[in-house]
């Protein structure tokens, strides 16, 4: 079963096998990169006679940025605040953010999972990392991996809630873009 | 007739196997030690097979037929990028290795795309040094048809693999086509996928049999394993080569992994028991692979004798 609401793939010519296999490849790659839950609808259009490969997707609601209280517990201690880290994955980003806000001399790490800040303002709402930017980076990586390798001319338009990716062997002309947009609209309305 | 087999067992007492094979007049093609395990690729006279089977049972080893032993197969992908590797190409290469062949993976510089795919003279020559080549293509039938130009000039049998089913007449330059193994992003683990790998091995085996049959019509002056044995004995430096297989066997010769300029004369001077020198019965030339030496044994029609 697809975890996405809509996942349509259309390939021109007698390429049913290719369509079926590309469906598997897309699912495998999105699953590998942990992106599958963030994509709501996906439309893939391939015309092998041109040849061109296009993907249009709608994203699920935005991902909030990761703050200090998401990665650890903040407590008031004598002389400042202590953060007990629960999720070590973002440790590097956390330290970077704390150094930037408070300065290196006021951030101390007495143990692997404990950081003490010599400051009266609690760091709870300080942003550790922008998850959305990371997600968009991963998504671009996934699209480049999914598209057949020879399709080196690429165009990728990303908005807050959608992305539109075209890859082709020859240069991408405006007529081609509008033609593909038309095809994808047809797929959406079908 | 010599039978190609693979022995897998413990390192302990494996020298008994080596001794027996030598006593029987067989050849040791490859010896791979992995910690306490050993994998031996052997050529054993078929009438004495029983003796080896008994010994391997005593040593609790496993003896299986390796139909591709003594051959070198190229597994060619359009490039070495993530789109083609690791799953399909590596699994195919590994599966061929399990059946005894020496497999080399070759990624082309500009093999990608439908209209823009190219192969150059060097790549063609390198693939031609093998006994057979497996070209790994993708999921679109149209592209597989168009990419024919990549292997049109290759003189060794070419086995094409790809996703969709294709008609034989669509690929006139290929020896055979194995469907249902196009591009994929997961490991080959399902029974159907393994069966496809079996089909590739079977097809490669058939291609090699065809080459063997062609060779028997004009037999080689001497057999490649014999050349290997003589080189190993008379050019001891070959044992110090860092390559896992210092002398790779082909159906019509061997590749010796030593620098060409330094060792070509020493190799030509290798003498057989009959008094014949290797330089008289084979051409010795630089291989396209690194700085290695390529030995191609001449057929009896050129030398006038077989020994």
Residue ranges, per PLM feature:
Chain B
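Short amphipathic alpha-helix segments
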Residues: 8-29, 52
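Generic non-transmembrane alpha-helical segments
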Residues: 16-24, 55, 59, 95, ...
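Conserved short beta-strand edge segments in small beta-sheet-based binding/regulatory domains
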Residues: 5, 27-33, 54-75
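Short, low-order "capping/linker" segments at domain edges
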Residues: 47, 72-95
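Helix N-cap motif at beta-to-alpha junctions
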Residues: 10-11, 43-51, 55
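Long, charge-rich C-terminal accessory regions
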Residues: 92-95, 99-263
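C-terminal, charge/polar-rich interaction regions
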Residues: 247-307
């Amino acid at each position: 079963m697809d975890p996405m609401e809509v996942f349509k793939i259309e390939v021109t010519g007698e390429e049913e096998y290719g369509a079926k296999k590309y469906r598997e490849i897309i699912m495998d790659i999105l699953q590998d990169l942990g992106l599958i839950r963030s994509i709501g609808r996906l439309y893939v259009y391939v015309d092998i006679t041109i040849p061109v490969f296009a993907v249009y997707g709608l994203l699920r609601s935005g991902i909030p940025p990761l703050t200090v209280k998401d990665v650890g517990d903040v407590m008031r201690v004598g002389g400042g605040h202590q953060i007990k880290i629960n999720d070590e994955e973002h440790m590097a980003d956390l330290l970077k953010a704390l150094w930037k806000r408070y300065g290196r001399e006021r951030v101390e790490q007495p143990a692997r999972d404990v950081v003490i800040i010599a400051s009266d303002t609690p760091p709870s709402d300080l942003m550790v990392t922008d998850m959305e930017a990371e997600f968009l980076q991963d998504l671009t990586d996934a699209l480049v991996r999914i598209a057949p390798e020879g399709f080196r001319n690429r165009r990728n338009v990303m908005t807050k809630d959608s992305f539109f990716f075209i890859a082709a062997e020859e240069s991408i002309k405006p007529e081609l873009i509008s033609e593909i947009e038309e095809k994808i609209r047809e797929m959406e309305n079908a | 007739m010599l039978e190609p087999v693979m022995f897998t067992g413990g390192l302990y007492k494996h020298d008994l196997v080596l001794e027996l094979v030598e006593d029987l007049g067989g050849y040791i093609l490859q010896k791979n030690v992995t910690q306490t395990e050993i994998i031996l690729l052997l050529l054993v006279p078929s009438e004495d097979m029983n003796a080896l089977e008994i010994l391997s049972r005593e040593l609790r080893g496993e003896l299986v037929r390796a139909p591709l032993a003594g051959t070198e197969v190229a597994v060619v992908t359009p490039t070495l990028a993530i789109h083609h590797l690791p799953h399909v190409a590596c699994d195919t290469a590994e599966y061929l290795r399990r059946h005894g062949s020496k497999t080399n993976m070759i990624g082309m510089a500009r093999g990608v795309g439908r209209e823009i795919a190219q192969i150059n003279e060097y790549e063609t020559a390198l693939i031609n040094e093998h006994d057979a080549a497996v070209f790994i293509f993708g999921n679109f039938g149209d592209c597989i048809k168009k990419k024919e130009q990549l292997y049109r000039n290759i003189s060794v049998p070419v086995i094409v693999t790809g996703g969709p089913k294709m008609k034989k007449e669509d690929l006139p330059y290929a020896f055979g086509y194995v469907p249902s193994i196009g591009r994929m992003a997961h490991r080959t683990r399902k029974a159907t996928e393994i069966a496809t790998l079996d089909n590739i091995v079977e097809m490669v085996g058939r291609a090699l049999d065809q080459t063997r049959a062609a060779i028997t019509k004009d037999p080689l002056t001497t057999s490649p394993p014999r050349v290997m044995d003589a080189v190993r004995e008379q050019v001891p430096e070959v044992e110090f080569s860092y390559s896992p297989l210092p002398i790779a066997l082909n159906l019509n010769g061997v590749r010796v992994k030593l620098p060409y300029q330094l060792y070509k004369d020493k190799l030509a001077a290798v003498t057989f028991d009959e008094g014949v020198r290797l330089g008289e019965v084979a051409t010795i030339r630089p291989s396209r692979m690194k700085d290695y030496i390529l030995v191609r044994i001449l057929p009896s029609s050129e030398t006038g004798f077989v020994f």
